[in-house]
Amino acid sequence: EQKGWSGHLSDRLNEILPKERILTEEQMDRHTTFRTGGPARYFLVIETRKELAQVLAWLQEEALPWFLLGNGSNLLVGDRGYRGAILHLAGEFLKTEIDEATIRCGAGAMLSAVSRSAMEAGLTGLEFASGIPGTIGGAVRMNAGAYNGEIAGVTESVEVMEPDGRCRVYNREEMAFGYRTSIVKTKPCVVLSTVLKLQKGDRSEISATMQELSAKRREKQPLEYPSAGSTFKRPEGYFAGKLIMDAGLAGACVGGAQVSEKHCGFVINRKNATSADVAGLIQKVTETVQEKFGVTLEPEVIFLGDFEK
């Protein structure tokens, strides 16, 4: 019975995508920067808008949950995996075009690569993003930022596809950007492309700023271990890393997951951690900080799949 059903599912899918871009039971530890996570029932690599619209229609017909994966650099997938479809954009979604001070980039393009292209074109405004390890789509969805810059500050418009396959463009105001959020985080849709508006600048100055931020990052962050970057959002009026340190949690472990001693705001995969280890440590940190300081730390990381004890 079960086999027949999944056979019928994949027949339809084979009409939409070539079979080398339809992966089943794909281990998600290969696709997240935490290097943890169980199998996704489907992992679909999508290269065109037409394919995307057809896949979204198929998912809706089959009532399958789906999640759009960028670089997996802000994502914790449960050890039992995800029983829906992971969508990953490639092909035409990787393109970047620069016209004067405007950059149009596909949602699958890497933010750090776009930042580098901007520097090479003598455009300033994206320096802050040079070390952020995500895609443009993910950066827009969560309004990624670092070193006093955020993507909202340079976004002119964002094109999305709704689950019904229709495309629409949001301007900056309509994007409703906030701290680590935007309209596309709060409603189901897929970011297709983004237009960024930068300023003409001095290439060598831009490059120097990027190198300086990069050195700062290496010095202060535990880049030598798998992690999802900053694990917690910044609580109003505090710094997460300092609260965690002051709570005596530097180096605290659950299984193979550890609060980085180099930067307490980072939970790292120190040694073969599972997602349950990471989730357990996040919970331990949250509870301890709440208890000691009465401050609620909210994870910045997205949890996908099953995290029941």
Predicted regions and their residues:
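Short acidic (Asp/Glu) patches
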Residues: S112, M142-A144, E173-Y179
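Residues embedded in well-ordered beta-strands within globular domains across many folds
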Residues: I86, E127, E159, V301-I302
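Short, basic and Ser/Thr-rich N-terminal targeting/leader segments
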Residues: E62, L69-N71, V154, Y225-P226, ...
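Anion-binding (especially nucleotide phosphate/pyrophosphate-binding) glycine-rich loop
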Residues: G4-I136
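Structural signature of FAD isoalloxazine-binding scaffolds in flavoprotein oxidoreductases
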Residues: G38, L44-R49, L76-L94, R141-R172, ...
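Phosphate/pyrophosphate- and phosphate-bearing ligand-binding catalytic cores of soluble enzymes
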Residues: L23, L75, M161-T288, K292-K309
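Conserved active-site and cofactor/substrate-binding residues in soluble primary-metabolism enzymes
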Residues: G4, H8, D29, E47-K50, ...
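A gly/ser-rich beta-alpha-beta helix-loop segment of oxidoreductase catalytic cores
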Residues: S115-E156, S227, T231
